[in-house]
Amino acid sequence: MGIVIIIAVTLGACTNGDLPTKESKDSLVEKKVEPVSETSDVEIGESGSDDTDILIAYFSWSGNTKQLAGMIQEQTGGELFEIEPETPYTDDINELSGISLQEQRDNIRPALISVLEDISQYEVIFIGYPNWWNNMPMPVFTFLEEYDFSGKTVIPFTTYGNGVWGKSVNSIQEMLPESVILDGLAIQEHELQNAPSKVSEWLKELGMI
């Protein structure tokens, strides 16, 4: 597979993290937006081949990352897997701000609802998440620690209000030293309407389609 990297990830761009303020709560989580299309609002198990070697795992609070995961699935035929904590997060962004920050400070690993039966069948694994507090939400840390990613090609994608990647790519590299980590795709919340073409260009450059 010929791989061309098209996105340069700038690590540590936000030295103070994506800290929410009274004026800008979107720095913690994505704003909830209308689906780009009916097909982009994909339910788990709705599409994808059972014999695919591509997995698209994602965590989504507002629905934005879910939409982006659906776009990737539509173009790659990969299997979707939602990373869901056993205890759902509140819809109140003020409460969520405090909860998610405390989880990060305490290095919590929230228990997840679903389990992959066999990750060995996948050669390429996309990992999607919003930027929370300059890093991945803690359920994504749980997911990455529960499976053996040795020898896998891992490709991150993120949705964000501010801060883009934060420290998340560094975290993935540290957690998965035996994996090949390719540069990913970052989509700001207001760019979701134009994301399908960006996803297509990105996947073509990576040699995925």
Show the residue positions of the predicted features.
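Sec-dependent N-terminal signal peptides
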Residues: 1-6
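C-terminal motif of bacterial Sec signal peptides marking the signal peptidase cleavage site
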Residues: 11-13
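N-terminal beta1-alpha1-beta2 submodule of the flavodoxin-like/Rossmannoid cofactor-binding fold
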Residues: 15, 19-123, 127, 134-136, ...
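Short, surface-exposed connector motifs at secondary-structure boundaries
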Residues: 123-125, 150-155, 181
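Beta-strand-rich cores of mature extracytoplasmic or soluble domains
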Residues: 131-135, 152-155
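Short, conserved loop/helix-junction motifs that constitute active-site signature segments
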Residues: 145-151, 175-176
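Short, glycine-/small-residue-rich phosphate/pyrophosphate-handling segment
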Residues: 155-191
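A short acidic/glycine-rich loop-to-helix N-cap element
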Residues: 194-195
